[in-house]
Amino acid sequence: MGSSKSKPKDPSQRRRSLEPPDSTHHGGFPASQTPNKTAAPDTHRTPSRSFGTVATEPKLFGGFNTSDTVTSPQRAGALAGGVTTFVALYDYESRTETDLSFKKGERLQIVNNTEGDWWLAHSLTTGQTGYIPSNYVAPSDSIQAEEWYFGKITRRESERLLLNPENPRGTFLVRESETTKGAYCLSVSDFDNAKGLNVKHYKIRKLDSGGFYITSRTQFSSLQQLVAYYSKHADGLCHRLTNVCPTSKPQTQGLAKDAWEIPRESLRLEVKLGQGCFGEVWMGTWNGTTRVAIKTLKPGTMSPEAFLQEAQVMKKLRHEKLVQLYAVVSEEPIYIVTEYMSKGSLLDFLKGEMGKYLRLPQLVDMAAQIASGMAYVERMNYVHRDLRAANILVGENLVCKVADFGLARLIEDNEYTARQGAKFPIKWTAPEAALYGRFTIKSDVWSFGILLTELTTKGRVPYPGMVNREVLDQVERGYRMPCPPECPESLHDLMCQCWRKDPEERPTFEYLQAFLEDYFTSTEPPVPAWREPIGLELLLAPEASLWGTGAWLRAEGPRFGEQPQSRMWHGEVSGAPSLIKTVLGHP
């Protein structure tokens, strides 16, 4: 098992304030976390807000809450540059007596930022002092404080956010360029009849004099002025800028300052979400204030001392595609407190009502997210040991996060440690790990290949019809699962690369992430335009679609007797998105 060697480079989460200040600025453990009854989320979605006057746009049907997380640069150490006054990016309600409550837009004087993720601050509005989450603030009058500035998010993540069908045409964000140091990128949602809902990306270049431009004939002294101009004039863009891309409050880094080993009495178990061989998962509340997920382990499952030592390493693993470990109760029965994911385990999601609406683009996107989380685990020299759909959690907007990393090593159950016992996940385990206990990141890659079959078959058990002993024998003899029905050969070929006998010949997670993120631009032949999947929608109801509006009707219309090129849809149709009577997307 490896441990963290350096501070993760991956950004934390955040959002920005929109209104311009003046006229020139603009995881054998049950992973399911879906309760039987609706629970109030710990964070709420902040809707997009118009930038200037928005022209009337036809409404695309379907919709969803936006991603659980949006990344941004870490701001720790900002005081070293002499900045002590920060502005609040979100509302925050105190969770302990030492926390400081504040409202979005409040100005805060930072007293001490040397103690990690929670800074001591003094509100210039209320006059009170207390600890605040550092990823909820940004330096005053900085670009980081702008609501439209999303920092170091990837092109793919920006598209995931902007392809929300509830976003009107012209919804936008500004991010750092992935390819040019010091440059920025303006990402804008667009719509046309050929592509449906799509995203255009414009590089923002920097002048030697310090100004900015997209086209050299129109230059600006600041990014704020650039955004203000293009909110009034398209001037070569696909559309003028209308709404800032909406997002949600980020997770705080930990529950509060010094809230790591917490008393059992501070947790309230409210809704049982699942039960497995080694314990249960509950939705609950910490300190009467904060929604969390709580894993309760059966006594004797693992040594409390070994668990606490491993948890110290696990809590240092921070990435937007890993479920965050918040706190622990280290005396038996051990409690593990993590962030709450509203849609439960990926396995349950695939097999449930929502799974039947997933199409290949969404499945590949989910696989890319998992590969992204595991690429971070790979960079940190860590090993998961139990990667499968049951240990992936799903949140809003089809966000997927890896859970239960590292815990499998600590289990002290004979039916598990024998590696061929009834509780051991043999069908997901690489042969060198199952036979000889050689768990490495390359055995995780093998497991990822099996997870891909779970995705493409909507949760089918791997190696159907085979028992564990037979699977191990057949795999050792060279057997590999055939291509699942309706799975592209190129994706099956990727699975087979993950299942190479020599671990060193298996791809890295970095490669897997890049392959999957670029899958539809680099591996597949063009598909007819009317079959082209063009976006993501979160399933708010079973009948909601996972495709963009026009694409859904063009793709599914023929089976209901409707012509793909028809511009109107009438009547009640089973399986159609919730708004049935609509004009197909027209800008």
UniProtKB/Swiss-Prot annotation:
InterPro entries named among the record's database cross-references: Kinase-like_dom_sf, Non-receptor_tyrosine_kinases, Prot_kinase_dom, Protein_kinase_ATP_BS, Ser-Thr/Tyr_kinase_cat_dom, SH2, SH2_dom_sf, SH3-like_dom_sf
Family matches, as CDD domains: PTKc_Src_Fyn_like, SH2_Src_Src, SH3_Src
Chain segments carrying region Disordered: 1-58
Positions of post-translational Phosphotyrosine modification: 416
Coiled-coil annotated residue ranges, if any: none
Keywords of the record: ATP-binding, Kinase, Lipoprotein, Myristate, Nucleotide-binding, Oncogene, Phosphoprotein, SH2 domain, SH3 domain, Transferase, Tyrosine-protein kinase
Keyword 4Fe-4S among record annotations: no
Domain SH3 as annotated: residue spans: 81-142
Enzyme class name: transferase
Residues at the catalytic site: 386
Chain ranges of the SH2 domain: 148-245
Protein residues bound to ATP: 273-281, 295
Catalytic activity: L-tyrosyl-[protein] + ATP = O-phospho-L-tyrosyl-[protein] + ADP + H(+)
MF-aspect GO terms: ATP binding; non-membrane spanning protein tyrosine kinase activity
SMART domains: SH2, SH3, TyrKc
Enzyme Commission code(s) on record: 2.7.10.2
Protein modification: The phosphorylated form is termed pp60v-src.
Domain Protein kinase residue range list: 267-520
Chain intervals with Basic and acidic residues compositional bias: 7-25
Source domain of life: Viruses
Residues linked to a lipid group, N-myristoyl glycine type: 2
Family: Belongs to the protein kinase superfamily. Tyr protein kinase family. SRC subfamily.
Biological function: This phosphoprotein, required for both the initiation and the maintenance of neoplastic transformation, is a protein kinase that catalyzes the phosphorylation of tyrosine residues in vitro.
UniProt protein name: Tyrosine-protein kinase transforming protein Src
Annotated gene: V-SRC
